[in-house]
Amino acid sequence: MRSIMVQSAKTDSVNQQTIEGLKLQIKKLNSKAGQLKMDLHDLAEGLPIDYQNLTALAAETYEIYRHLDELKSQLKSLEKNHDMGY
């Protein structure tokens, strides 16, 4: 019984570290995503000047937001499992 409790405490600690790590990653990506969004907006406002950069910047912005969405889904799942005691 004691072994199960120790293992559960270790798992809980690992899950909490994972959750905190994901939150930190999300915070950093949110900042970068916001900057890319502003850059994309500025580029769009200046069109047709620098139109050659539009595709690359849009792709980078898309990829950041896709990754951010993926991390948020992982975080939500981990928090749900953590709250349920898994």
Swiss-Prot record:
Alphabetical list of InterPro entries matching this protein: Helix_hairpin_bin_sf, Put_N_fixation
One Pfam family, short name: Rop-like
Keyword Ligase annotated: no
GO biological process per UniProt: nitrogen fixation
Keywords: Nitrogen fixation
Domain of life: Bacteria
Family classification: Belongs to the UPF0437 family.
Name of the protein: UPF0437 protein Ava_4254
Species of origin: Trichormus variabilis (strain ATCC 29413 / PCC 7937) (Anabaena variabilis)
Highest classification ranks of the organism: Bacteria, Bacillati, Cyanobacteriota, Cyanophyceae, Nostocales
